[in-house]
């Protein structure tokens, strides 16, 4: 019996998709080719973020022969727009059932074949998250490359963030981390690794391949008003939230004597 059908799900592979009709079929096939040889129970969760093309229809065509393939559709999507990556990831984490979640974009620029190496690195290091790093091999235009470098400088300055490529969506993490991230706020997907570290989780980086977009168009704005200014404001917001966070862990108090009292502890 195929690994994806036996036992509790270990790995969820999750990708948000907004108008990716030309990529979703190949995406599913590439994920299957990458994960099946790992011999672990898995599922694929695609988040349709308000697509106005045939993205959802093409996913549905694939589903009858693939019990491991699931699709969740975002609600309350603005007309002809998506809710954005942060919201889509937020919905995806709540739909995923695996102990671990591999995240990637649906545009095929992330290579699902990297997931196996990420799993091995997580096992070897004991890390809670493996963050992909495309900085050595980005297949983007000059504007986006320069924007990433500038963003990295500001993140290091304001957040002491040493992650080289926090904008790379290809990452592997424990699902519990995803459920604690404030992804219901726009723009927070850019700060997943640094936020995870702030929450006390360990993050390691792994160089990954980055492929040119094969079909469709980028969903990111390139102008200063679409990315630079909102990105700086998001940085300031994250810095403010970090300073305001307080521990919420608590231990229930009982009427039993404390351990040190029973053992004749300090008087």
Spans of features found by a protein language model:
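Short aromatic/hydrophobic "clamp" motif used to bind/position activated sugar donors
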Residues: 101
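Conserved donor nucleotide-binding strand/loop of the catalytic core
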Residues: 42, 56-95
């Amino acid at each position: 019996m195929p690994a994806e059908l036996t036992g509790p799900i270990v790995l969820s592979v999750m990708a948000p998709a907004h108008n990716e009709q030309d990529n979703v079929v190949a995406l599913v096939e590439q994920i299957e080719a990458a994960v099946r040889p790992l011999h672990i129970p898995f599922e694929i969760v695609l988040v349709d973020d308000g697509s106005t093309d045939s993205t959802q229809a093409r996913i549905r065509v694939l589903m009858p022969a693939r019990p491991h393939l699931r699709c969740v559709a975002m609600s309350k999507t603005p007309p002809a727009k998506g809710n954005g990556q942060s919201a889509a990831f937020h919905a995806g984490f709540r739909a995923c059932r695996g102990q671990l979640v591999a995240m990637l974009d649906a545009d095929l620029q992330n290579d699902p074949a990297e997931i196996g190496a990420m799993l091995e690195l997580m096992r070897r290091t004991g890390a809670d998250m493996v963050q992909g790093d495309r900085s050595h091999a980005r297949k983007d235009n000059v504007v986006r490359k320069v924007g990433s470098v500038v963003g990295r400088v500001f993140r290091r300055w304001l957040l002491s963030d040493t992650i080289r490529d926090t904008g790379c969506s290809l990452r592997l993490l424990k699902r519990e981390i995803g459920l604690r991230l404030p992804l219901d706020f726009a723009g927070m997907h850019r700060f997943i690794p640094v936020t995870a570290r702030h929450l006390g989780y360990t993050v390691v980086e792994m160089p990954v391949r980055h492929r040119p977009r094969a079909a469709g168009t980028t969903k990111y704005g390139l102008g200063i008003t679409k990315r630079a200014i909102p990105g700086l404001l998001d940085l300031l917001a994250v810095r403010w939230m970090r300073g305001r966070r307080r521990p919420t862990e608590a231990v229930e108090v009982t009427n039993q004597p404390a351990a040190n009292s029973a053992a004749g502890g300090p008087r």
